[in-house]
Every structure is written in C-alpha cells, then in structure tokens.
Amino acid sequence: MRNLIFFVIPFHFWLPAEGFKLNTNLLETNLINLGVVLGLLVYFGKGVLNNLLDKRKQTILSTIRDAEERYKEATDKLKQAQIRLQQAELKANEIRVNGLSEMEKEKQDLINIADEDSKRLEDSKNATIRFEEQRAIEQVRQQVSRLALERASEVLNNCLNSELHSRMIDYHIGLLKTMGSTTE
C-alpha cells in the first residue's frame, strides 16, 4: 500500500525524513526519467513498433513490386510499339518502292504508247503520201495518154483518109474500153 501512496501523492509532498527527497538536479532527474520512459517504450512499444515497421516494409515491397510490374508492362508495350513502328516503316518503304516502280512502269507505258502512236502516224502519213503519189501518177498517166491520143488523132486526121480514120478510131475506142475496164 505504501507503494501505492508513492504513486498517488506527488514527490514534492513527501517528507524528506522517510528516505525520499526531492532531487533538484535537473540533469540527473531528466536522465532517469528519460531512461525510464525509454525503457518503458522499448518494453511495451517494441511489438507495436515492429508491427508498424513490418507493415511499412510490406507496403514498400508491394509498391516496389507494382512498380517493377508496371516497368515490365511499359517495357513490353515499348517493344511492341517499336515492332509496330518498324513494321510501319517497312510497309511505308514498300509502298514508296512500289509507288516508284509503278510510276516508272506507267512512265514507260506512256512512252511506249506515244512511240506506237508516232509510228502509226508515220505509217499513216507514208500510206497517204504513197496513195497521193499513185493517184498523181495515175492522173499524169491518164493525161499523157489523153494527150498522146489527141496528138495521134491529130496526126492521123491529117495523114489518113476517112476510111482508115474510122478504122483507127474504132480500134482505139475498143482499146480504151478494155483499158478502162482493167483500171476499174
């Protein structure tokens, strides 16, 4: 019971005769108080502190694991994005090369078509020229024949009598008829 009194009654009311006295040395008193408080804290707070530290440790470890998982996911996504980028670049290069080759092919096709058109026009021009030459030659031939016949007719008219003249005319008319039927 006496021990209980010591706790209930503050120290400054205790009588110095009983063996307890008021310690006025603040340094000593604070060290003892600090020692007692620290001892009590260590004894009673050890479990609580360990519990708090374990929870904090688990929280930090789970955060680190989550961060590592997110890092792996981000790395995987980055690799996939890089692969898609490379595929897109390859596709773009393929499209560009195909476009260039297609453009070259179209260019060559246009050149070939233009050459063919030019050759056809040249052939058509040459055919037209040959046709016109043949027509001109035929006209000249007909004119020469007509003039020759007229000249021969004049010569014969002057030189021949009317009977011979009639026979010659008939002969040449027959000749012209056969000539006319072969030209048509």
UniProtKB/Swiss-Prot annotation:
Keyword set, alphabetical order: ATP synthesis, ATP-binding, CF(0), Chloroplast, Hydrogen ion transport, Ion transport, Membrane, Nucleotide-binding, Plastid, Thylakoid, Transmembrane, Transmembrane helix, Transport
A Pfam family of this chain: ATP-synt_B
Primary localization class, coarse: plastid
Cellular localisation: Plastid, Chloroplast thylakoid membrane
Keyword DNA damage in record: no
Family membership: Belongs to the ATPase B chain family.
Other remarks on this protein: In plastids the F-type ATPase is also known as CF(1)CF(0).
Entry protein name: ATP synthase subunit b, chloroplastic
